[in-house]
Amino acid sequence: GLDPQSPAPDPSNPDASSDRALRTSGLVAYGALGLPLAFAALPIYVHVPRLYAEGLGLSLALVGAVLLAARVVDAVTDPLIGWANDRLPRRRLWIALALPVLGVGMVGLLAPPTGAGALWLFALLVLVSLAYSVATIAYNAWGAEVGRTPAARTRFVASREAFALVGVVLAAALPGLLAAGELAGLARLAWIFLPLLAGFGLWTLWRAPAPPAVRAGTAPAWAGLRAALGEPAFARLLAVFAANGIAAAIPSATVLFFVADVLQAAELGGLFLVLYFVAAAASLPLWLRVSQRIGKLRAWLVSMVLAVAVFAWAGLLGSGDLVAYGLICVLSGLALGADLSLPPSLLADLLARSRAERHACGHAEGSSDGRAEAIGRAEGRAEMRVKGRPAPLEAGACFGWWNFVTKANLALAAGLALPLLAVLGYAPGARDAAATAALAGVYGFVPVMLKFGAIALLWRWRGLIEPALPVAPPLAAAVCRGGEG
């Protein structure tokens, strides 16, 4: 949605292009698709375990095993989806193909037919998750490519995550408002999802700033994916993202059980989720300003410390501690805003630095760039590093690995935490002291320990993940020449 009266683009001035893309209409249009995608994610990761365990009578251990199996399948395919995105870097096309499949699958998952069991759950989870992955990988790569400066990339991510948090709040609040029972409420939620997906999806596809032309990837699948992991900064950012992500995934898989059986306030589960995500949405402008003052990485560190300081108290709560838990939801929600916006923005900056290095190599080496490209085509991008030139990071491959880690975290959280609770004697509806203590420990204390690990890793690798200075063309050219001796 650019103003037809605006001046013609000046290709020699990237900042001017960035300013045009950053107009409010463009930012809002890009972010719009984040709403239905997040609206779909919350029921998948929060409501589905309880829906199939309590509503359909499957055992908690069986539901956990099915979730683990489906998410392992899904996670393994994400890097391949990312590689395919690089081979055919048409972000809008991938999204347009994925959204109808996602809509149909969500209806089947949240409104299962009579007699649906573990096989139905597995099949629909795989279908929905694959469609969701195709859409989100292309969508995230689009956002990373359209911003020309670090500030622009942060704003595109913040727009996407602001819409996403609105979608999460709607998905958390609506089931209880649509019907008295959770089963009926989730079934109606699925039918509300379809027009949301169509409307917001079309808004983004038609009105968002067009992604820039991106050279198609040429490396074989494994070579391209391995090249991404071979980049030290990306590999370390991914490791921190994994450690931090599983710390957040365990509470997501167990929160409704905690509210129902530890706090004994099942009817308030939706309200607590709304508090959590509204606080996260409200915090996005704050984290944007903090990141501009102290850097994105240090702002993320501050949010992790806040999350640990607040969530450490959750495992000590008991029946009736509703005000205390509400305060924990609000304060940990503030920390969530940074978790959602800053890591993808750091990844977008890594991709931009890689593009700057490749661009500088082209100017510095002239025809040797063609030689490097030929090597890349024949032997894969990983081989380019052997020739002394930086292996360029591809957005699709990186976001494929990013989604892989996200899904692996959720798979481990559901596939390990739920069976662990069963082994420790907890079953949905249990009220004895030993069972609720086990649930409180898994929900509150395990994530805090994992978050400490993420903090330590991020601090250790801070200089590599977020260098003090961006890569300037002369420096990038020097990197290209390094290794040529």
Per-region residue spans from a language model:
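Long, intrinsically disordered low-complexity tandem-repeat segments
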Residues: A364, S368-V386
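Membrane-embedded alpha-helical bundles of multi-pass transporters/translocases
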Residues: D19-H359, R371, E383, R389-C480, ...
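Intrinsically disordered and other compositionally biased segments
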Residues: D10, A16-S17, E379, G388-A391
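Short, Lys/Arg-rich, polar N-terminal cytosolic tail immediately upstream
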Residues: L2-R23
